[in-house]
Amino acid sequence: MKSWILSCVIVLTTIFNTSFANAAPDLEVNTPAISAIKNSMQARHPSLAPHYASGAVGLTNNGLIAVHDASAVPLKERQSINAVVSAENADRSALYKEIASGNGHPEWEAGIRDAFASRWIDKAQPGWWYQTKDGWAKK
């Protein structure tokens, strides 16, 4: 009887551990909050695109963006681009948090951020700058 119970416990433990270990976030989950954030980011993208192309702004390896080459932005526009970068980063951080919450696992936020960091870099256009663990690189 003890060995039967022990066998059942082992089987159940294996089943539950496997299902939790194999759980992966749904990066396409959608909620009203996620939709609002994505809309905000899409509306901002046209103002960022020329700065990605010029190398002024690059994609970081932590899922955000950063001013990569401030000299590529005229002095009178630098404050403006810094504000746009800050707004984009706030939305990106909120997006990762909302996707984790939408999956019912707020603790997944860091992994979701990492997944998106790779996604953004993979989708970057030729000529855009992105950050690696060793520094900046041009796609």
PLM regions with names:
Residues V84-A100:
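Short, well-ordered alpha-helical segments
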Residues S7-N17:
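Bacterial N-terminal signal peptides
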Residues N17-A23:
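Sec/Tat signal peptide C-region and signal peptidase I cleavage site
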Residues A23-R78, A83, G102-K139:
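Amphipathic, charged alpha-helical segments and their helix-to-coil junctions
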Residues M1-W4:
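Positively charged n-region of N-terminal signal peptides that target proteins for export
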